[in-house]
């Protein structure tokens, strides 16, 4: 079971596909008693749930859910499955498999709208009778490439499995969608085609262009479009189904080698032609008739000469005419679009509609009988004229052919008379033939279009056959349909139950053959075998005098009483008569055979067919090419060969031929079955009738299919394939390097894997698996591959890291070497010998260079020679290379040619294999036909012999009759005499005879009644004997099953006792859990109190950070001052140093002079003493000065070091604070930028709105002025009209004189009248368009109300989910406490709890992703809404401009009218025309005035709508601003949660696999308890090993730290020894002191970092600071004496460098140890801080999430409002589009007017000179104006079309956005649940972090203690050094004094 987060990819379809996690947990926790929970038989509901009260003596007393107590037999009680099996997706997984379990599982899933359920190897679907969102694009994407067990049941899953099997197994596939009529087969077929067209798209447009020049759609578009076209002409409403397929179709979708769509074709079977002319009351004819009459396309109504009322046409109005679930108008547009996409030419399209209209007219043709004759004659020709016109026929010829057809008698044609009924029959037959042939021709054209000529390899066939039908009136069509379903059910049974078990036997698997009793051969043989129903029907069709009665008698004679499936129906009141009954698998059907012989022969009027063949309509002539009275037709538009003679082929024979082809196709494919179920007969959504569903389940073999799936081995794989794929699970099981058989390898591999070894079997060539095991192996393989890849990555990364480390080591050694050499050079560079060496070495080099030059010359000559040789060789090699390249190219060409030939050969081979398969199939068909023919021939010969015997007997009877006739003649004469005597006696006997005849009749009736009763009793005896045999068999079976039940009952009793013990343990554990829950609640309160304290601490820390920032600034200023003082001190020190060097130089000169004057006098000695005393004095002064300088420098240095250390530490802290603040600053900047952008967009929108308002106000004022102008114009026109009327009297006197001119100008008048009529018609069209738009507005508002109701339902569902979520959280807490308390006793339960918590962490992560997705979607929504608002405003401006243009055009029209009136006044020649024109113009003006008033009303409505829009836009802008704020808050949450995500990712990945394993283990815990315990023990051992490993790791870490400390101690001891050895080395001590100073500063920084947590170390730090001050004082003393020992320092520097290197190594190790301590400490603090931060963030997030959810709800409501507004705008745009179309028509009319005017101008030039010139000028000006208007209208039309497309796109986006908002609300709700789970996990992490911090703190204290000991040892060493210094000074003074 996948989690809710994994189901998120299905979008809004998820709740309709799989139970939520909450429901699954509730089902597992639901109380359930396996002993008492049962189903019991109920007379009304079939089965009901009940609880057992008692069991006594084979009787069970139970209490039903309704509260009723019932007592039933043991065999009427069925155990109930545990709650975890509620709504299970695969019913084969049920513990108890029986009818009530299957029924209730389907019912509960159906109630939750999960309509798809697996039933073993096939899928069951229940018709929902409503639209469900489970077929959209995201669901298609989610199912793509998914295994069956990875996704919920769905028709897409079946389709994808078929597609994957085709690609992997390289075998053709078929999907058989079966079920009764109305079960949903057609819808599922459409979804299958939609799926294949989506996943296997080619994306290429077809290259062909039709005659209209339009490019066709892609192949996938055409495949999808074929469906609506075929549905329009082949689907109709029936009693059980509003969209029932009245024909069968087998759609083959062909794929190429890469799995892409290659082509497709469709085969159709048995279109129900009779529906064209006849329908039952509750049914209707084919959809296309009602689509045409829906008036969606008025041009069709005009073209077909029909009305929009179906009741005007007899053929289509015998039943219902409307269907509530079908919109005929929308369906007409879809049909018309499909015709265009599928490449029908315009002529073909028109022909299709015309022929459909002609069929409707055929039904209205009337005929009557001639007086005193039986001959028929037409009763009116109007309808016939229409039908003939539509078919391009002569009406008279058509009527003559119908009433007087020509019949061929011998070699001559004779005219035959027809009665009225015969004519009506002929008309109906022709209508059916035309419709049927047109349908088959359309299928042929579709196949031609779908055949792309691309290479194709395999196909997937989808079968959609009309479902099983049981009507009140069942005819030949129903028999064919039901027979087809019988054959398909038999194919299913054979495939599922027979072939499957034969495969087991063939593979050598131990298997006991199971007979499921699903053989339907008896019924099939009754219909199709020789002397069956079809055979007798075809035989009767051969005899010319055969009737329905003779056919019925033959059926009774042949089958009644001989076949159990053939029965005589019982008469029922109120139902049509039935002649025989057949027992089908789905029920007993009563058939009426009236008219079967005519239907089967399907005769046509050959004379009318001849007219059709000669029709000018190409399509009609093509339909009847080569047709005769009875046609040979092939299904699917393919003409098949004739079977029965050359004259005709019957309908039943053709049907059987096509059915056999279909079954052959299906047998050559791998089938996939989908069983469709009708839930109820009333088409009510959500309701299920138990008895109806059970009947279908029994008939469809659902239970048997589940049993064979459970008992058998549905999954199988070849040994080699298994070894190749699953070797990775345990590679060591199959030894490398040696040959091993694939079977043995598979056996070893499976034996080494930890799975149930009873779940698979080994066959001869394959290994067989039970259901579900192969999926488990796939999961294990995926886990293994993930481990191997992870390990490989780790090894690669480790290798790369080691290589990099080796490079670093080498680089370090090189640097040390360079440093050593440079230092050595610096020491010896002033040595005189070295200087001499530097001078001599270049001289030596010059001599060496001369030698080298000579050598180089020799080498140069040698290399020159070698170069010449190599050049020669190179040329030779290049020549060889050229030849080799030529050879290589030749070889490549040969290889390519061979490869091409090989590919051609392979293709030919494949084609030959395919043709071989096809030929084999044909051979089978031919052999089957031959066998049928032989059987029929044998039957006919037997009949012939029988008839010959009867003829001979009849001849004998005739001879006997002739002899008796002669005797009678003789006796006649004798009797004549007797008759005379007896006449008198006859009169007396007449009365007696009358009495006797009455008695005879009564006796005959009684005799007939007794005969009937006898026949019925015999039938009963036969049926009773058969029933007795069956019952005896059932008794035997029941006795065997009773023994099995007893055994099972004993086992169940044992299991019951065991479960009772488990129940007691579970109850005890529940009590413990409740106690632990109370304790945890108390802990939770404490933690919440601690969290509040931590929050206050965080606020204090933030305040401290602000103070530290201020202090940083002050300290920086102080640092700058100290640096200036240091610079001054350095300058003074340099000056003193210079003086000291001068004095030392003078001292040296004086000493040299003293040595030279060694033998000087005493005076000189005294002088020397004086000078020496002066020198000593100066020296002391110098020393005191230097000491003072040193002291001041030391104090400054000390202050500087203190301040630097302190500031450095503060800088580090502040640097971190600064980084954090900079990060926050950047985040705030981003938020500010977003806000600024939002503000800009809002301000822009506001500005646009203001502009729009101003524009609208300006337009309003302009419209008012225009209105006033129009009013003035109207007044002028009325005045002109009055004036013209007064002048009309005067003009009438001149009428006679101008008759000649009137005749010439009448043409102009006619043109103007046409123009006025066109304007009238356009006005009417505008009114119609307006009413249509108003209707669309109403429908959109209704849709809006529906959406609002749906939203409220969603809100209620969401509230319900929240309540369920809180309940689930409480249950999670209970489970958690249970697992924590029972951790030691129940390790397994503890692990499960841990994994569940890990799963919740994963859920939290997925919810985070959902929140991120919602943030992005909300941002997109905001931007899109803003853009749409702007676009809509622009469109409104455009429409206003269009209105203004229309007004301008209106004024132009008014000007034109005024000009023509002026022409009337100027030209007396046009007197009469002007009078009539003025009258017509006045009437037109009145109409225009009315239209103008209507336009004013529309303008007012537009103003109101604009105001509403402005108000809504302002609301939207406010919502957008609020949404922006919410989005920024969500982005903050997103960043915080992303940080948490990175920390939790690793833990989630580790826990994911184990969680699924543990959940599966919980489900099997009752049956696998022992296995689970062993698993637990193993896992405990693994955990112990992990703990031991962790301990070892910690011990190693401690040991490494101890070793580093030991190394540090050793280095300290070495340093002490070095100090003792080098007592005079004061420079060494200075370096050590500097190092100690650095160490002290480092310790100070470490101390201050840990100051908040480790307060107890404060005392140690104070001691360290005091020791630092002492060291600094010692440093000052050392520096004062350093000047005296400078020479000694120079001598000892080399030694110092060696010791320095060893010292640095020790120091580095010490630094590493201290860094480790610091790292541990920082980790500890970071964990604590993280804990605090997360706890505060969680509380904030919870509050913010509630606000966000509320805001999202508001945003959704506003989005809905925006959608309605957009819909209104779209409607307005549609009005404008209609207006533009109207203007386009006006443009065409004006162009026509220009042409007429031009013609009139030519004529007027001949009649008038001056007046003509004026008229020409005016007309030219008029032409120019009209051309300008035409151009402007074209531009406006283009703009209107663009605007329309844009608005349509926006409406779609808004609807999509609404759906996105709903999804986001659901995601947010899930996020709340997951965040609550996350809080608990964080608390647990915080506790672990506290434990870890305590461990780290103890380690730190120990290391700190060791560090203090090391510092004490260093202090001791320094004190010893000081003592040595004192001694050295004393020794030095002694030496000086002695000198």
Curated annotation (Swiss-Prot):
* Keyword vocabulary terms for this entry: Actin-binding, ATP-binding, Calmodulin-binding, Coiled coil, Cytoplasm, Hearing, Methylation, Motor protein, Muscle protein, Myosin, Nucleotide-binding, Phosphoprotein, Thick filament
Tell me which residues make up the Myosin motor domain. 86-782
List-wise, which residues carry Phosphotyrosine? 389, 424, 1492
Q: In the UniProt record, which is one GO cellular component term?
A: cytoplasmic ribonucleoprotein granule
Phosphoserine modification sites? 1092, 1096, 1162, 1237, 1243, 1261, 1288, 1292, 1303, 1306, 1474, 1495, 1514, 1542, 1554, 1574, 1600, 1603, 1714, 1726, 1739
- Tell me what effect the entry lists for residue 1566 to K: Found in a renal cell carcinoma sample; somatic mutation
Give the SUPFAM superfamilies listed for this entry: Myosin rod fragments, P-loop containing nucleoside triphosphate hydrolases, Tropomyosin
Q: Which residues are recorded with the post-translational modification N6,N6,N6-trimethyllysine?
A: 130
Recorded domain comment: The rodlike tail sequence is highly repetitive, showing cycles of a 28-residue repeat pattern composed of 4 heptapeptides, characteristic for alpha-helical coiled coils. Limited proteolysis of myosin heavy chain produces 1 light meromyosin (LMM) and 1 heavy meromyosin (HMM). HMM can be further cleaved into 2 globular subfragments (S1) and 1 rod-shaped subfragment (S2).
Family according to the record: Belongs to the TRAFAC class myosin-kinesin ATPase superfamily. Myosin family.
SUBUNIT field:
Muscle myosin is a hexameric protein that consists of 2 heavy chain subunits (MHC), 2 alkali light chain subunits (MLC) and 2 regulatory light chain subunits (MLC-2). Interacts with SLC26A5.
Name-wise, this protein is Myosin-1
Q: Name the source organism.
A: Homo sapiens (Human)
